[in-house]
Amino acid sequence: MLLSVKSPSLILVRAFAVVICFLSLLPTRDGRSFAVSIDPADVATFAAAAEQNAKLKSDLTWTFCAKRQRGWILYTPLIQRLLNTNAAPETNAFAQALADWQSSAGLPSTGVLDQQTWMKMVAVFQSRRIKDRSTPPPGALTRVSASEFFDPERPEDLRYVERQAYAAYKRLVAAVTADLSLDSNENWLKIISAFRSPAYQAQLRKQSPKSGRASLAVNSPHFTGRALDLYVGGEPVSTDDRNRAIQVNTKVYQWLVKNAGLYGFYPYFYEPWHWEYCPQYSVE
């Protein structure tokens, strides 16, 4: 989408470019000129990209698991983590960081988060998930106290976690509690669901036949005991966009996005509460 000549944003871009050129001519105290490396053409390019991103973040249409989706704003924290930026999607800085990432990913470096770029990002997110979903031997699982679950009355046979994943989870909870000064009496990061047997997963799918594989997979990572659903706010496991908007804006979720990889946990991008223990993936 090209900006019109009368666009206020283009007028500001041109004014900024003039200021840049003027500053480059000013002497410093030691008599040298300022070294300004910003290309006015790049400034204009990223301004145009930022204008498109401001619309696409809510309007981009795409499909995931046979379900039509709209926009990528719910995934902003994950995108910012991938791009290594804190810039908001509608800014020039975000567009520039995106262009750099696009170049490294073999995509046209437009700075626009269009469908091609977004689906590439989805592929990256999905690549950091559990591949082998075999059920572990009983000795590899540990039974967790009911007090560590969101539902303290959860049946004993549904309170198992793979041992190494549980140890990493405890370290993660200790870190986030210290960093964010969380109240230990609240439900933040309590376990909603962990190990599920194939038989129990089939039972859940039978109870919710319209849930789809995005929510209740036939070959679930929960079979491994290394996938944990954790409480990050709102309704615990609702994929309603309004609920996910609440979840992705909590300080706990945003901390996880930035730091969970240090403890071996990586997200399922579509469900803010779902984290998988995959220590084999390096933190980027």
What name fits each language-model region?
Residues 2-183, 261:
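Cell-envelope/ECM-targeting effectors and their regulatory/trafficking segments
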Residues 90-103, 199, 269-283:
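Acidic helix/loop microenvironments that form the catalytic cleft of cell-wall polysaccharide enzymes
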Residues 108-113, 177-194, 215-219, 264-272:
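Surface-exposed patches in mature extracellular/periplasmic domains of secreted proteins
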Residues 110, 132-133, 203-207, 242-243:
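Short, solvent-exposed loop/turn and secondary-structure capping segments
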Residues 113, 117, 125, 193-195, ...:
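A mature extracytoplasmic/lumenal domain signature
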Residues 171-176, 192, 200, 221:
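Membrane-proximal structural modules of membrane-associated proteins and complexes
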Residues 198-213:
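Charged, often glycine-rich, active-site loop that binds/positions anionic groups
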Residues 211-284:
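Catalytic cores and adjacent binding grooves of peptidoglycan-active enzymes
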